[in-house]
Amino acid sequence: MLNPYLLRNQIDAISKKLLKKKFKLDISLISSLEKKRKKLQIKTDNLQYKHNTLSALFKKEKKIQELDENLKRTLTKSSKNLSELKIELNLLQEKIHNFSLSIPNIPSDDVPEGNSSENNKIVKYWGKKREYSFAVRDHVEIGNKLNQLDWKSSAKISGARFIVMKGNIALLHRALSQFMLDLHTIKHGYTETYVPYLVNHDSLYGTGQLPKFTDDLFHINSIDKKKYVLIPTAEVPLTNLFSNQILNETELPIMLTAHTPCFRSEASSYGRDSKGLIRLHQFDKVELVQIIQPELSMNALELLTHHAEKVLQLLELPYRKVLLCGGEMGFSATKTYDLEVWFPSQKKYREISSCSNMSDFQARRMKTRYKKKKEKSNSFVHTLNGSGLAIGRTLAAILENYQDSDGRVTIPKILQKKYMQGIEYIN
């Protein structure tokens, strides 16, 4: 949620910045609502002052047993009018609040203009693409030939966009999650956290998935007469651990990681990547979350992105780092880097991680603040998150980049001894 002060006092400037995200702010509507709110607030405050004066006089007369019936009637009427005004004001404030929930975060000044991936800025390339002397297979064909990716069984028991993994590919999938968690906890300093896979609607409002992306979520409607949603990412439960809290500055930065399944309906991606591990309804991911002071958040974004990059570097997978343009960015983000890994079968880079600084956007929705050491007032924290990494896509990238002409797949060296029980090849 944006700072209400900006919407009240810098509406034109904010509207212009939001155009970078392809969002047209209805200035006339928000100005009209704010004008009504101010007028109603003044009216309510004035009546409250008069009511308080009458109440004090009534208490004084009651004490000396000289009650004035006119005063009593006036006080009763004042109380009724004040109650009606407060209800009207609350309804208007709720309307403004709901409207504010539909407004995305403001993009950082260094975010490129543009509405498509062609306008993204390539920051760097890493790794050398392998040259093949044979016809390159995609990861679906490789998995089928190895008889370890079972699409027929998953379609039978669940439907499209699900997968059953078997044998050493299933072992590799597990190995990747363990490797990523070890790297982020032991080397990068994150605290491993186990979180629920079902969350309430308040949590999804807090991190910004609701109300805008309700169609992309899997909703569970009948547990203890409460509504739950399967998590689309561990960002939701990890970040909401600190909702409605005031943290001490000494607690910051907070760095958390979790390995969870993620569930997405992919309603907005209908028809895209219907084949393979790229876009499933259920997939696993290791998530990175940081909560930090505002002045440190942009440096923290660089660090968090580096932590995700390190996974790709140690697996020796060629990738590129991309700064997203305004039109490609997520709803809650102020700045986002995508890491895109090379897929030789497609001869292009595909997203494997998205690392974002959310500034105070989520913190305002969650009411997460921190107490500065020498200041009386509390400030909103900044939140960051990123994939470190998406496990299914990492697995697919390994199958393609490490394939041999005879159909076998070499296991990345860093995984062989510690995580893959000494296995060097899948064949």
From Swiss-Prot:
Pathways per UniProt: Aminoacyl-tRNA biosynthesis; selenocysteinyl-tRNA(Sec) biosynthesis; L-seryl-tRNA(Sec) from L-serine and tRNA(Sec): step 1/1
Chain positions recorded as ATP binding sites: R264, S265, E266, E351, I352, S353, S354
Record's subunit section: Homodimer. The tRNA molecule binds across the dimer.
Pfam families on file: Seryl_tRNA_N, tRNA-synt_2b
InterPro entries: aa-tRNA-synt_IIb, aa-tRNA-synth_II, aa-tRNA-synth_II/BPL/LPL, Ser-tRNA-ligase_type_1, Ser-tRNA-synth_1_N, SerRS_1_N_sf, SerRS_core, tRNA-bd_arm
Gene Ontology biological process terms in this record: selenocysteine biosynthetic process; seryl-tRNA aminoacylation
Top-level class of the enzyme under EC nomenclature: ligase
Protein's UniProt name: Serine--tRNA ligase
Classification lineage: Bacteria, Pseudomonadati, Pseudomonadota, Gammaproteobacteria, Enterobacterales
Organism whose genome encodes this protein: Buchnera aphidicola subsp. Schizaphis graminum (strain Sg)
Annotated L-serine binding sites: T233, A234, E235, E287, S387
The record's note on its domains: Consists of two distinct domains, a catalytic core and a N-terminal extension that is involved in tRNA binding.
Keywords from the UniProt entry: Aminoacyl-tRNA synthetase, ATP-binding, Cytoplasm, Ligase, Nucleotide-binding, Protein biosynthesis
